[in-house]
């Protein structure tokens, strides 16, 4: 793999080559390590009030177990970052932000929360994220979980075990436009989940994919 520094992480930009990786995700299945992304938790009775105040989309439209794409905005309505908001319940949300903006986003959310008094947790250094993407991702993940993965609608999520790895957030989100899942887990589980996915992924021709192909895939998706 070709490794480059990015937002304090050493990240794989490509493995066998961007074109080959791009096409492989479109027709089969690929695995991305995107653990550099930031994860914040908002917990409290005024979680929705805070998020309505700082995000551009309507938080009241999200039901439990669903996710919403949105923007974090400043006091003038200008965009600070884009993010995905996951709703566990009325009083608990997870915000997933871009790696290069973690500190800036966190400080802005903290500042705006002062009048709402919710509990905030920055779990960016404690959580890892793998993106399993492509048409074969469904059959591959099905081998490792105890629920029907195709029953999980787009932009939905569950907290489930993947084999012996506990409480993984399995989300039908991703940037590739080829379908698939994002898997949020504790740092101590990520290497084991990576390995078991490749063990079970042999028959599905699973390949590791770099960040360059992630960008070309999402650009092509539009």
Task: Explain the meaning of each model-derived region.
Residues 1-222:
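Basic, glycine/lysine-rich polyanion-binding surfaces/domains
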């Amino acid at each position: 793999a070709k490794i480059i520094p990015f937002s304090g992480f050493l990240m794989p930009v490509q493995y066998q080559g961007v074109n080959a990786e791009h096409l492989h995700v479109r027709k089969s299945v690929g695995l991305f390590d995107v653990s550099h992304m930031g994860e914040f938790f908002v917990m409290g009775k005024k979680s929705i009030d805070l998020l309505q105040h700082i995000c551009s989309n309507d938080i009241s439209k999200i039901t439990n177990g669903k996710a919403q794409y949105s923007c974090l905005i400043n006091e003038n309505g200008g965009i600070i970052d884009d993010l995905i908001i996951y709703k566990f319940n009325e009083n608990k949300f997870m915000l997933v932000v871009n790696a290069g903006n973690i500190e800036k986003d966190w400080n802005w959310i903290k500042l705006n929360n002062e009048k709402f008094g919710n509990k905030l947790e920055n779990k960016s250094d404690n959580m890892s994220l793998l993106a399993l993407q492509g048409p074969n991702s469904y059959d591959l993940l099905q081998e490792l979980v105890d629920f029907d993965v195709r029953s999980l609608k787009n932009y939905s999520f569950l907290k489930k075990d993947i084999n012996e790895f506990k409480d993984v957030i399995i989300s039908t989100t991703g940037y590739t436009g080829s379908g698939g899942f994002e898997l949020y887990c504790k740092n101590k589980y990520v290497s084991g989940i990576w390995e078991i996915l490749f063990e079970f992924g042999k028959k599905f021709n699973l390949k590791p994919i770099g960040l360059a192909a992630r960008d070309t895939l999402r650009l092509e998706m539009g």
